[in-house]
Amino acid sequence: MYNPYQQQQQGMGYNPQQQTGYGYNNYQMPQQPQFNQQPMYPQATGFVPQQPNLYGSNFQTSGGSGMAPQQTGFSQQQTMQPQQTGYIQTQPTGFGGTAPIVTENSELKIPSIRLSFISAEDQKKFEHLFRTAVPKGEQSISGDSASGILLRSGLSAVTLAEIWNLSDIDKTGSLLFPEFALSLHLCSMAKRGEPLPGILPEKWLNEVRSFVDQINFTVPDDPSKILANTPFANFAPKKESDWLAPQSTGYLQNQSAPPMTSFQPQVTGFGGQGLVSQATGGVPMPSTTFGNAAGLTAQRTGGGTLIPLQPQQTAGLIPAQKTGPLNPQTTGFNQQSLQQQRTGGLPQQLTGYQGPPQGQGQQLQQQRTGGFPQVQSQPTGGFVPQTSFQQPQLVSQRTGPMQAQPTGSLQAQPTGRPGEWGFVSMPTGGIPGLNAMQQHFLPNNQLPTSNLHSAMDNKLKENVTWAITKQEKQIYDGLFQAWDNQKKGYVDSNVALNVFTKSGLSRSDLESIWTLVDTDDTGKLNKNQFAVAMHLIYRRLNGYDIPLRLPPELIPPADRTLKDTMDSLKNSLKGGVNNKPTKPPKPQSKPDGTRFKNDDNNFGYVSNVRHRRKSTSDESHKSSVKSSSDYDLSIEDMKKLIHEKRILLDALDTEDQANNYSRSSSSMHEKQIIENLKKEIMAVQTKLDERGNDGPSSDERNKLLATLDHLTRDVVPRLISDIHKVNQEISRKKAEVFKLELLKKNPSWNPEDDESQIQGTGPNGEVTDYDRIKYQSRQKLKQRMAALTGKSTGGNSDLDLELKQATEKAQDEASRQSEMIQDIAAGIKTMEDECAAKLSSSVTEDVGHEKWEQGKGISSEVAKFVKELEAFSKEQRRNIAKSQKQEQTREPLAKQQTNASLVSDSGAAKSAYATPEERAAYIKQQAEKRMNERLAKLGITRKSKSTEQKPPVESKSVSNHSPVPDSEVKSVTRNANEVEVQKPKPDSQPVSKNREPAEQPNSKADTNSVGSQNVVSNTNDDTSGDDDDEEYKAILKQKQEMEARERERKLRKQKAKEERLAKIKKEMEEMKKREMEESQDEEEEEAKQVTSVHVSRAQSSNANSNVIPQQETATENVNTVSQPTSTDTAKQSYHPHESNPFSKMNNNTSQNSTVTNTGTNPFFKSTSQETKIDPHKAEAQRASQRGVASSGGWSDSEEEESEEESPNRAGAAKLASLLFGGMPQPPTTSSSSLNNDAEKVSEQEHENAKQVASTPLSNDDNGKTDSGPSGFAGENESSFSQAPPIPVDAPPAPNSIPPPPPPPPQFSNEAPPVPDSIPPPPPPPSVPSTVPALPDSMPPPPPPPPPPAAPNNTSSSQQASGAPNIGALLGQITGGASLRKVETKVSSGATVGRVL
């Protein structure tokens, strides 16, 4: 609060030698009583700087003019003293050269509202700056003042323009305080390098708007606005700056007594007339800055101690005012500046108080000075002090009863013609992405396109107009000049292509833009065309469509003018000169009397009343045409009128019909065009549906994108975090486990780094680094104490080191795991980005989808057609899907029928499959049918069936790769066991050798046919996808050829079979006769048995040589039976082997290795047709037959004789059972089929012949681990092994064994599993000795699972003597004395022959 009695001293360049007013000890001011009666001259009372101090000499008239010091303060009435008149000299007060003082506009009323986005300190600074920049009487800062302040930030003009657009919310061109604070805050953001927002945040905008509204509510209404246009407008208060208004100069003639003042009456040349007392102090004057001078110092008035006045500068550069000798000064505590005065040079005037002059609307207030706190202020004219270094300017005045104009809340209006360049209003909210676009399209800039799209945000901007704004035009012109290096005034197509492709738009969009811009088809663009192209690119980047033709706003002015000129020329050329509008010809010269021509019809003004009757009568006579409105019409006239009207009506009807026809025809034509368009659209939609649209719809993509976001942003990070936690926990647990192991081994060990003993002081009891350091210091102290006292600390450095290494190892492993997890997370992130890029859609696609897929934003008719098209498309897709499904179903069925027909042609009427070939064909047909059904259910169509359409006989080459069902395996093996007993004599070996070359060509021919068939089938496979009919014909042709070969082969086999059967029957009859003859005598029996051995060997040899083709039949049995029950894996492995010719070659050349490696696996048997005889094994076979053996077989050394060196003994047992089939057999647990077949061999010769045909199967099964021998003598072995198909088609197991075999699995690979009750057979040479003792061996039961044994010394000696003891030999057989211990390392009878 201001204290008027407190001295206010300012050391701003005052001159201490100057005193004004009273001296230090005087009560009166010095007066100069000269020039008492001189007239007053003009006195310069402005603030002239640096005037000399005039107190050092007398007042001179020529030393300038100035105001005499006046007494201030309250005192007694004093006599009037003469006042110096004339040129009052100015008084310098030492203000020259001082710095300007910044003053605040304290009249501003700014509400105390806090802006949240600005700190309190910054808001206070901004308010101070705003108050100093806003002049008095204003509430906002102008654009010029604001630009001067904002330019001090050092930012570019473009950035400041964006800041201004953001800050000037109401677009008034000036800023209120909240807007000004916002602009300064944005400047500080830009200075810090932060990006400016394109649109103000909602919170900031709401706060600024509410602040502005609060300021607008607090501004009082102007009284002059209220009094305007009313009768009381003259009573409106004058403005303080109205210096042209008449001034009251205090002249009062009839004043009875002067008022009580502290001033002495002054003589001013009018003796006896006193000046009105002036109060010149008591108010703190506002600081002003005229030039380099400082503000005036406040003066103290009133009674009390007399204080000298402060030095005041009263000179300046402001012109004086004509206001009389002394202008009334403002008194009281009102903050107003001293007014410049001009005194002198006027007619003699009375000073003092008088009434105001007429016509002045203000009265001078009477003042009481000295000691009174309430002083009335007086408005006087003058200049408002300026706060700058410019010349003072006049303040705008209201001159007359004009209504005050509002100067706030103006909206920026576009000026000029619509679309005219350079006159387009700037859009609000800034131009989005324009700065980024300017930087992106510069020549040397290689920024990625994604930055530009992210700046544009690819969203529709409402403030992106068609017209080009000034700022945009400047940016586009700058880009044009940057690319036009040679200053040609245009850019060619190559440069424009480089510029436009930087936008990242599609080729079709850029082509459309080029077509719109290059109107002259010159292949180059000038500056205006380049600007239009860039603006179209800019709009396209903001999500707008490219127009089909340029709008008027984008046509350059030069092009528009040229186009208008060309149009006018075309019109003139079309219509000729007569088409131009004719103007009245101008007179060549002024009309004169010589050229005057009188017009008699041109009367002057004639009154209508005077000639009314005459004119009406003339008109009635002239108008002879009757109308329907006449009242005196005759019948003829009425008929005539009716006829005329009828003609007119007919003409109107005809015209209406013509118009209707034309309209209907045009409408029909338009409808036809619309229908054609609809049909074309339907056809295109049909093509699209047929081609198929694999991409998901917009809604599906949005759903997938939402699911992707959920998985990648919620689920995956949580899983990664959990995995990290588990990984760290595993690392800790590993360290703990290792520590526990060490503690278990060393109970006295006390680990040093055991954190379990550390008491954590961190949050939630966690162990911090400080806790570890503290614990380590304690441990060190403990160790030192232990070293001093000699006690053990329980520590062990080695164990500690091991624990530390284990912990570090666990941590390293955990870190590696973490890196792997990070790599996985990075891979997931990459996949997420790829998926998001594929699933995300642009704004244009969404708008197009809503418009043309959902029917939004288009007319009702088009929307209706869109819905119809959608329904039509759905129906099309449904039909196409149904037809495709039917084709997929029909194709496998057709192939199944084809295959079935191929198979049924060869054996359709042979369902009973009396022969093995027929059975194989039937089984194969059934297998193919079931296979096709399964594949059809899985939706798989088999393109080529050539490998499966081969005749059943051709499958022998791949029989090793086919699984065999148990039932078929058992039946085939049973037959093999039944026939194997009838071993032929050794003398039949030449027969088999002779027959072997005859059979090999057949087998080779079959192999060749298979190879050729594979070639043909592969060729058909290649072309099957193109033409099914050709494939079908080729398959039929192959089928016919194979059937012909099959018939020929069957005829040959049947003929050979009949011959072999006849021979076998003869041999059987001879053998039967021998048995009957030798059964009477024991010696004769022995001789008979020896003979029968030879006979059976010969028979077996003959059977093997004759039954070679029948072995193929058994192979077909195995293959065809195995297919229906094989697994999918077996099927997949089956086809490559069957169609691969190299598998046959490998099988032909590697029989030995295959047999030895595969063991008991029947699926890997070779197809060799010539097998070399191993002489060592043959010799071992002969030795075994003769009874020469190294030991009884029960020694521990397994290396003395191997399983492969000893012959197969299973055939000997079967031979013995066949030879003695007529005798009573001991009860066994084997199936009855074996015994019955053995007992009825002699009676059922035809069945035995069939069983003989399958003999190689059993032989191969029994001897599949041997590369050379197969259970016969050496001669038989050679003849047998050289038979081509013997080792190929052997079934794996005999049929006589039930599926669950006996428990002991101790049979070797050489012998097939036999029933538990039948003892293992001895070697073949010991067979004769077993015949008479067979009944003796019935009572003793056999040992539980006796392994096969080698022949012992006893049997060999008996064989050598010639008359062996048969009973003793049979006892040895039943007792298992001659059996040797074997290692059961392959499989037992339960697994042989099963499907793996």
UniProtKB/Swiss-Prot annotation:
Q: Where is the EH domain?
A: 122-211, 472-561
Q: Which protein is depicted?
A: Actin cytoskeleton-regulatory complex protein PAN1
The organism named in the record is Candida albicans (strain SC5314 / ATCC MYA-2876) (Yeast)
Instruction: Spell out the Pro residues composition-biased ranges.
Output: 1284-1327, 1337-1350
Q: Is Isomerase included in the keywords of this UniProt record?
A: no
Compositional bias (Acidic residues) at which positions?
Answer: 1196-1205
Q: What is the lineage of its organism?
A: Eukaryota, Fungi, Dikarya, Ascomycota, Saccharomycotina
* PROSITE patterns named among the record's database cross-references: EF_HAND_2, EH, WH2
Q: Which Pfam families match?
A: DUF1720, EH
Biased-composition ranges, Basic and acidic residues, are 877-893, 1032-1049, 1056-1077, 1171-1180, 1237-1249
